């Protein structure tokens, strides 16, 4: 995926076909939980006094009323008006955002943003930084995902009231800054 290598599936037995393995993994994820290494997803840090205005111009969504420490699914259009990429925007504050992109889309999204900053909105004070390689990403899905993750991050309350859908938290985990987001790509609670 992009410049990353990622397994397609894991065989349980040598005789198991790719189709059988994927069906087994999908069924188990829907019944219990599954994990995927999503580190290949692009991550772009957007900072500066005009960061909010910039993302309002770059994406199809409106971000003016978005609260800090919340996330939103986003679409980026190309100059032809067609969907160029999708991802999630995480708002730390009005001057600091993290944008995720598709795995193969990160370079073109960053280039697209930089081009518009230089040619269309050079007056905006915005700084972009690719942070894809700085963060490992794991997606844990399925009905037992919260139960599993609660055993790892025991200081975080994962209840709906304390950790609403499409919010995220930044915290220290074993002397390392970590981010955890509640989102859903498969239709469960997130």
Residue ranges and their predicted role:
Residues 1-190:
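Glycine/proline-enriched, intrinsically flexible loops and inter-domain linkers
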